[in-house]
Each structure stands twice: as structure tokens, then as C-alpha cells.
Amino acid sequence: MKRSTLILLTTALLVLAALSWWYRPWTPYSPSVMTRLLHPEYRLQNFRQMEKVFPFRVIPASSEPFSFPRGEASLPEQFIHDGRVIDTAEFMLRTQTTGLMVLHQGTNVFEQYYLEATREDRFTSWSVAKSVIGTLTAIALKDGHIASLDDPVKQYVSELDGAAWGEVPIRDLLRMASGIQFSEVYDEKFSDINMLFYRTFLLGEGVRDVIADLPAARPPGEIFHYVSPNTQILGWVLERATGKPIAEYAAEALWQPLGMQDEAIWSLDQGGVELGFCCLNMTLRDYSKLGQLYLQQGVWQDRQLLPEGWVEQASRRPEPWLAAGNGYPERGYGYHLWVPKDPDQEFFFNGVWGQTVWVSEKHNVVVAKTSVDPLFRQHMAEVISFMRAVSEFVAAAGEKNNRG
């Protein structure tokens, strides 16, 4: 065989191998799909159809679906943020809102979809899933699957005995105080969080394998350090404590009793493990039910789903290092939920790209907002101002209507 022919054949084989790796027809994790996930041209569609991006496990709709009674309310035309008047319509467009739903006193008073989204769409949660994991942890505690929040991880996940994770109490996973060394900086190409995505989504490694041997930077329970592996480990504890995959336990403990109207899906790694720190996909109406459960102090249709006092414990932490200003100027943290600066009986679930479920106990309001906002960090304080304005406006309108 001539040298030139051999070189040509070798080159062709290398190109074929590269194309095969890039498109990977034998696996659901295709780099060609992964690299388009966040691309401006595709993300609007991807965030509403993640079943075409990742493998998943189904969470069936409840056999007894619940619909909120309907009412009618408008949004404030303007709101104040940082001393400036913000036009609501402009804000909704600028933050690339795909859905907005407002509940007042358990009534659906506003529901609207944008950017071609519909009520049937399953919107991806990103880190709102963390609050769902926190909620499931509370239910597992109430039902006796978890004995105490002070139990160490190794008591439930024997594989982590001897690892830095093993000695971390469940409580410190919930309040993001594990002490584990990890960088959750999305803007740095090779940060730990981006390498977690690369290794799990592109290289096909199991998510647990990627994070199991992370080292400790400090003892647990000393400072707030928000990192996604805390939630992934918490999900591992949940699976072992309940004896069920996370999605299956969510179906039994949350979806069925809450009367979730629509099927949800939870994205998986290649080994079939739920990506607990992100990637739950559900409809806007069902997102709002999660907020309403917390507004009702964990009670749903006369059934106490969360431990008594859980909502107060989760949203009103006494630790000064969990307050706003410890890593995030406009918000602090609780048990896997966020608390705005200077809270007035309010807290929220939040995910990147602008996913928010807001709960105002003072105004008896829940606001659920889904988005594809690339400037979500820059807009965070403004989103809080918007949520507060909507809560106050809707509550005031309701009181006015009640007075006749």
C-alpha cells in the first residue's frame, strides 16, 4: 500500500472516529446535542424539551389532580427597583420570561405564557430542583426514613465512609455548609461546576463518581458555601434512606398528595441516577403548587406533609453566616431555599437562567416565573423587587375587591 494511501485511510478513520464520538448514536449523551444546550439559538426550545437532551425518569401525574380555583388579577404596570421606575412589560421581555403564574389566597389569579411557551410545556428547573430535594428530605424526616438531621452522611451511604463527605451531617448539606472544596463559578471555563458538567454530560462519568472524593476545605457547619454537590449527596442519602430512586419517591411523597396535574421528568446521568442538583422538568402550574405547600406551612388538604415547624426552620435560620451578604449580596440561605435581604415573611426557590418560585406569607401570595435569561445574576435583585411588587399589588387588589 502506498504511503499516501495509508495516510489518507488513517485520516479518514480518525475523522470517522471523531464524528462517531461527537454524535454518539449509541448513547443518549451526545456531545453534538450537549454543546447546543445553552446556545442562544436553541436554549429557548431546549429548556422546554429536556427529554430530547437527557435521558430521564418519569414522575407520573397524580391520580387525583388538583386545580386551583380561578380568579382574575393584573400585574402592576410599573414597579420600583433601586429608586428607579421599571416598566413591567419591559422587565418581562428583558428577563426573557417564558411563564408567570400568581396565586393569591390559593386562587390562580394570573397565568400567562410568553416566547411561544404553553401551559403544557415542562420547564426545566435548574436549581429549583435543589429546593425539591430539600422538601423531600423534610418529608423523609417526618416519615421516619431519616432519623435526624444531625446524622452523618455515612450512616446512610456506606460508600462515603472514609471520604470527606462521610462525616458531614445532613443538616449541613441542607444549609450548604458541608465544608467541601468546590468552585461553583460558571464564568470560569474549567471551574469545578463546569468540569462536573463536562465529565458527566460529555465524558459519560457517573455524577456520584465525579464528586465522591472531593476534599474538605474546612470542617462542616462553619460557613455558607453554595455548591451543587451538596444537593447531589443529599439525593444519594434520600435514595438510601427511602430505598427508592428520587423520582419514584417524589411521585409517592409529593406528586400524588399535591395533586400534580402533569407528568414531570427528572434528567439522569448515564448510570440512571437523577441529577438532583438540577434538571427537574415540570409545568408552571405544578411549580406553583410547591410554593403553595410552603405558604400553607406544609399542610395540603388537611394533611401535614412537611414536619410541623419545618417552613419556619427552613426560611428563618438564626446563623449569621447564612444571612444576605455572605456570598450573595441580595439574598441569604436556609434549608435549601433562599431568603431575600431584609425579609418580610418571604423566601423563594431559585435556579439559574431565571427560574423562581416566590412565597410571600405576609401577602398570602405565590409567584412562579420561568425564564431563559442569560443575565439572571445581574437581574437577581431586580427580580426580588418585582416579586415583592407583584405580591403587594395582587394582595391590595384582592382586599379592595373583598370590600366591594
Predicted regions and their residues:
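N-terminal leader/targeting segments and the immediately adjacent pre-domain N-terminus
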Residues: 2-118, 146, 212, 389-404
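Non-transmembrane alpha-helical segments in soluble domains
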Residues: 89, 138, 154, 171-174, ...
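Extended ligand-binding groove/face enriched in aromatic
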Residues: 96, 124, 160-207
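Active-site SXXK
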Residues: 106, 124-149, 173, 234-238, ...
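Catalytic-site signature segments of enzymes, centered on catalytic residues
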Residues: 119-120, 187, 194-271, 278
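Active-site helix/loop module of the DD-peptidase/beta-lactamase fold
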Residues: 143-181, 213, 241-278, 282
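Active-site-proximal alpha-helical segments within enzyme catalytic domains
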Residues: 230-237, 276-299, 355-371
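Active-site Gly/Thr loop motif
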Residues: 261-264, 312-366
